[in-house]
Amino acid sequence: MPIKPGEEVIFVVPINKIKKRVPRWKRAPRAARFVREWIARHAKADEVIIGTDVNEKIWERGAEKPPGKLRVKVVVEESEGKRIARVSLA
């Protein structure tokens, strides 16, 4: 069941899934991409806008040590027939 436009939902994104699959120095950039893909899949969104607070949390400990999981708040909006998900820290 997709999220209705205007509805807020809390997700816990499991970043640990990709940590061992990529080189250490690529972990934070790959984690940011993974968050975008994961939210797009679970919120059924065409576009995902990640807030600066989420990006700073991913990069907080450097490129090699992103957090294992991330608790985020997702708000889905609909404009011009596209579903846009805005992601911020919960």
From Swiss-Prot:
Keywords attached to this entry: Ribonucleoprotein, Ribosomal protein
Domain of life of the native organism: Archaea
UniProt xrefs under InterPro entries: Ribosomal_eL31, Ribosomal_eL31_CS, Ribosomal_eL31_dom_sf
PROSITE patterns, alphabetized: RIBOSOMAL_L31E
Pfam families noted in UniProt: Ribosomal_L31e (PF01198)
Record-level Gene Ontology MF annotations: structural constituent of ribosome
A GO cellular-component term linked to this record: cytosolic large ribosomal subunit
Gene3D superfamilies per the UniProt record, alphabetical: 3.10.440.10
A GO BP entry: cytoplasmic translation
Subunit field text: Part of the 50S ribosomal subunit.
Family, per entry: Belongs to the eukaryotic ribosomal protein eL31 family.
The protein's name in its UniProt record: Large ribosomal subunit protein eL31
Taxonomic source organism: Thermococcus kodakarensis (strain ATCC BAA-918 / JCM 12380 / KOD1)
Higher taxonomy: Archaea, Methanobacteriati, Methanobacteriota, Thermococci, Thermococcales
Gene: rpl31e
